[in-house]
UniProtKB/Swiss-Prot annotation:
GO terms for biological process: purine nucleoside transmembrane transport; xenobiotic detoxification by transmembrane export across the plasma membrane. It comes from Escherichia coli (strain K12). Belongs to the major facilitator superfamily. Bcr/CmlA family. GO terms for cellular component: plasma membrane. The gene is punC. It is found in: Cell inner membrane. Transports purine nucleosides. Shows a broad specificity for purine nuclesides, including adenosine, 2-deoxyadenosine, guanosine and inosine. Uptake of purine nucleosides may support growth under nitrogen-limiting conditions. It also exhibits specificity for the uptake of certain sulfonamides, which are structural analogs of para-aminobenzoic acid (PABA). Was originally identified as a putative arabinose efflux transporter, however, overexpression of the gene has no effect on intracellular arabinose concentrations. It comes from the Bacteria. InterPro entries: Efflux_drug-R_Bcr/CmlA, MFS, MFS_dom, MFS_trans_sf. Keywords: Cell inner membrane, Cell membrane, Membrane, Transmembrane, Transmembrane helix, Transport. Residues 1-6, 63-71, 116-134, 181-208, 259-270, 320-340, 383-403 are cytoplasmic. Its main location: membrane. This is Purine nucleoside transporter. GO terms for molecular function: purine nucleoside transmembrane transporter activity; transmembrane transporter activity; xenobiotic transmembrane transporter activity.
């Protein structure tokens, strides 16, 4: 028997919690700085430390959830996050702020890993793509809405209210854990000893993860460079903020369009066409940099096409990466998310480093263009195992499992 709509809503809540924790407090940076009487760099460091903890701790929670079960590990992770959020109400200095933000990151990333594992645990394999396609657009929407919610709380209350809200949301998400029933899928102990190295030996896994990470890195490169690009073009901060709205809508269209398309076609049939759309849109965005006096609309049109492609690509490649490891999905999701965040961080770092050397638009779009090569490489990897190298790849994984 498949889970109902309430279970799906709960999974969606788990999926966006990490982004709420990341982005809701961004509008409060100045208020936190003034209240704690600390340098702006210390408040900014709280975000960097959070992202570092969020990326690294996933490698802990994933294997633990495979070994000890989703229920206890998720309960521990969310409890840690709730306590970290509650502690933020009494922060009096920058050091405590940094420590508690790291505690929050370690706790909340349990939800980021385990919600993906729960999808593969509780839904039949033929429906996993559609479930990811239903949830992932909300993941893309949350970074746009979280700062708006944070701003509203800041205007009407104080910056501490942001973390009180996160605490309340977490408590609501903790309660259903107590009613979480064990999965009915048969247990396969052969994957209990699967390591991260074993996962990377699978061309299907690393190919799909590379596609996921590269598409995300292209988006993060734009997020890093776009404020400089649009400021140089003469746009106000208000217009720059509004420029992210069509991108978010485009991502939603891609995600829910993919969900509808999956009722008629398989993910592996849709993927090559979506990757072509991604490549063409990125190349068009890069080419716009050579137009003299380029306008915001001329840049946003191809970029929004890329956002549509990403919204449709994500659920397909995530499902394809996790499917071969039904009893090691915690580890598989953890490594996938860490590699994705790592490549996004690298793309953002390169844009930040080069943006003072060349024009912001050309620098940013050139970094985006490099991700097309990585996407092509990822597709060739997973395609090779599908059509010609599958037996060899499976033999490698089987050999590693036997050891």
């Amino acid at each position: 028997m498949q889970p109902g709509k309430r279970f799906l809503v709960w999974l969606a809540g788990l999926s966006v919690l990490g982004f709420l924790a990341t982005d809701m407090y961004l509008p409060a940076f100045a208020a936190i700085q003034a209240d704690l009487q600390t340098p702006a760099s210390a408040v900014s460091a709280s975000l960097s430390l959070f992202l570092a903890g969020f990326a690294a701790a996933q490698l802990l929670w994933g294997p633990l959830s495979d070994r000890y079960g989703r229920k206890p590990v998720l309960l521990i992770g969310l409890t840690i996050f709730a306590l970290g959020s509650l502690g933020m109400l009494w922060v009096e200095n920058a050091a405590t702020l940094l420590v508690l933000r790291f505690v929050q990151a370690v706790g909340v990333c349990a939800a980021a890993v385990i919600w993906q594992a729960l999808v593969t645990d509780y839904y039949p394999s033929q429906k996993v793509n559609r479930i990811f396609a239903a949830i992932m657009p909300l993941v893309g929407l949350s970074p746009a809405l979280a700062p708006l919610l944070g701003s509203w709380l800041l205007v009407h209350f104080s910056w501490q209210a942001i973390f009180a809200t996160l605490f309340a949301i977490t408590v609501v998400l903790i309660l259903p854990i107590f009613w979480l029933k064990p999965t009915t899928k048969a247990r396969n102990n052969s994957q209990d000893g699967l390591t991260f190295t074993d996962l990377l030996r699978s061309k299907t896994y690393r190919g799909n993860v590379l596609i996921y990470a590269a598409c995300s890195a292209s988006f993060f490169a734009w997020l890093t460079g776009s404020p400089f690009i649009l400021s140089e073009m003469g746009y106000s901060p208000a217009v720059i903020g509004l420029s992210y709205v069509p991108q978010t809508i485009a991502f939603l269209i891609g995600g829910y369009g993919c969900r509808a398309a999956l009722q008629k076609w398989q993910g592996k049939q849709l993927l090559p066409w979506l990757l072509v759309l991604f490549a063409v849109s990125v190349i068009a965005t890069w080419a716009a940099g050579f137009i003299s006096h380029v306008s915001l609309v001329e840049i946003l049109i191809p970029f929004c096409v890329m956002a549509i492609a990403n919204g449709a690509i994500y659920p397909i490649v995530v499902a394809q990466a996790l499917r071969p490891f039904p009893h090691a999905t915690g580890r598989a999701a953890a490594l996938q998310n860490t590699l994705q965040l790592g490549l996004c961080f690298l793309a953002s770092l390169v844009v930040s480093w080069l943006i003072s050397i060349s024009t912001p638009l050309l620098t940013t779009t050139s970094v985006m263009l490099s991700t097309v090569v990585l996407v092509a490489l990822g597709y060739m990897m997973q395609r090779c195992e599908e059509v010609g190298c599958q037996n060899h790849g499976n033999a490698e994984v089987a050999h590693s499992e036997s050891h």
